[in-house]
Regions:
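Membrane-water interface signatures at transmembrane helix termini and the short loops
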Residues: 57-116, 172-177, 181
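Hydrophobic cores of alpha-helical transmembrane segments in multi-pass inner/ER membrane proteins
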Residues: 1, 9, 13, 105-128
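Hydrophobic residues within the alpha-helical transmembrane core of Major Facilitator Superfamily
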Residues: 15-18, 70, 91, 166
Length: 198
């Protein structure tokens, strides 16, 4: 339950980011081309990234990445390749765009899609055994005695939070005009890379 609750906003961010990219400037490659060109301005790659085919590739691959990555990382057969693509995507964004800590945070939070015990696979057996012995001595209650399920009140509050996260990103639809230009309803709508006007 708790792990799915943490995965939900991450998935929502990716999917709503993909939905936000379904617009003419992004799909035609104009917005991604301007962003990439600005990010690599003055480098030897600047002329190459301004090619229309490269801009289209960036636009469409970014859109597909946003829609597919949460589900590809959740599904065990595609998890490793999906995580590798997330590492490349977020590392690229960190170095090319000025969007602060978001790419690194998103990269680390992508590990939420793995099984809960995945870190154990990387820890040597002798360390696991020592940790287990120490933990068993310190623990006052057995896991069977702990109530790991949320109360009805907490479920109600969490349901309201989920509803808000589902609805608020679409409030821009109630403002007349094109959100990309007037930016009404832009905040909290997962439209981070779409403020570039072309």
């Amino acid at each position: 339950f708790w792990l799915w609750l943490l995965r939900f906003p991450m998935t929502l961010g990716y999917v709503y980011g993909g939905i936000a990219k379904i617009e003419p400037d992004w799909l035609s490659g104009k917005a991604p081309g301007a962003l990439i060109g600005k990010g690599l301005e003055g480098t030897f790659l600047e002329a190459w990234v301004r090619l229309p085919s490269v801009s289209l590739f960036y636009g469409w691959s970014g859109l597909l990445f946003d829609f597919l990555i949460p589900f590809a990382v959740l599904w065990k057969p595609t998890r490793k390749i999906a995580f590798l693509s997330a590492v490349l995507f977020h590392t690229h964004n960190y170095f090319v765009f000025s969007i602060g800590i978001f790419p690194l945070l998103a990269l680390f939070l992508t590990t939420l899609y793995f099984e809960p015990d995945f870190p154990e696979q990387w820890i040597p057996q002798w360390i696991k055994q020592q940790w287990s012995n120490w933990y068993c001595k310190k623990r006052k209650k057995s896991l069977k005695e702990l109530n790991l399920y949320p109360s009805k009140g907490l479920v109600s509050v969490l349901s309201l939070l989920i509803l808000i996260q589902l609805v608020v990103p679409f409030r821009h639809l109630f403002y007349p005009g094109w959100t990309v230009w007037h930016e009404e309803g832009h905040w909290f709508a997962w439209r981070m890379m779409l403020r570039q006007k072309t």
